[in-house]
């Protein structure tokens, strides 16, 4: 959290609002699918974590719901970057969820961050990787520490 300055938070939140607050669920789903496709390109082993949500069929209702759950979770985290109590509560919840997933490794959060760095510049005109990485990497460090103990 200390590396994610107030300016970084504002920039990340403004960028995210510009791509995510649209009422178009189709766009949200497309962005989410692009993120997961990129993640699977970065590390094919991650795909095995999502078999229960029918990830091989990118148009299945299970995969659709999962993509929205994950990216809506990210949306919630971004929305509360300036609210430490709520953010910490959400991070605790996410840490417990991911701890319970067989085969999950905290390095996958970093790989998801790489996917974000590839996809977000394609869907947002004002992507600032420095601000984004300050905030996202800070979240990853905290949640990873809580998972790994």
Swiss-Prot record:
<dbReference type="InterPro" id="IPR009050">
    <property type="entry name" value="Globin-like_sf"/>
</dbReference>
<feature type="domain" description="Globin">
    <location>
        <begin position="3"/>
        <end position="148"/>
    </location>
</feature>
<protein>
    <recommendedName>
        <fullName>Extracellular globin-2C</fullName>
    </recommendedName>
</protein>
<comment type="similarity">
    <text>Belongs to the globin family.</text>
</comment>
<dbReference type="GO" id="GO:0005506">
    <property type="term" value="F:iron ion binding"/>
</dbReference>
<comment type="subunit">
    <text>Giant hemoglobins of worms are formed of a monomeric subunit and a disulfide-bonded trimer. IIC is part of the disulfide bonded trimer composed of IIA, IIB and IIC.</text>
</comment>
<keyword id="KW-0349">Heme</keyword>
<dbReference type="InterPro" id="IPR014610">
    <property type="entry name" value="Haemoglobin_extracell"/>
</dbReference>
<dbReference type="GO" id="GO:0005833">
    <property type="term" value="C:hemoglobin complex"/>
</dbReference>
<feature type="binding site" description="proximal binding residue">
    <location>
        <position position="98"/>
    </location>
    <ligand>
        <name>heme b</name>
    </ligand>
</feature>
<dbReference type="GO" id="GO:0005344">
    <property type="term" value="F:oxygen carrier activity"/>
</dbReference>
<dbReference type="InterPro" id="IPR012292">
    <property type="entry name" value="Globin/Proto"/>
</dbReference>
<dbReference type="Pfam" id="PF00042">
    <property type="entry name" value="Globin"/>
</dbReference>
<dbReference type="InterPro" id="IPR044399">
    <property type="entry name" value="Mb-like_M"/>
</dbReference>
<keyword id="KW-1015">Disulfide bond</keyword>
<dbReference type="GO" id="GO:0019825">
    <property type="term" value="F:oxygen binding"/>
</dbReference>
<keyword id="KW-0561">Oxygen transport</keyword>
<keyword id="KW-0479">Metal-binding</keyword>
<dbReference type="GO" id="GO:0020037">
    <property type="term" value="F:heme binding"/>
</dbReference>
<keyword id="KW-0813">Transport</keyword>
<keyword id="KW-0408">Iron</keyword>
<keyword id="KW-0964">Secreted</keyword>
<dbReference type="GO" id="GO:0005576">
    <property type="term" value="C:extracellular region"/>
</dbReference>
<dbReference type="InterPro" id="IPR000971">
    <property type="entry name" value="Globin"/>
</dbReference>
<feature type="disulfide bond">
    <location>
        <begin position="4"/>
        <end position="126"/>
    </location>
</feature>
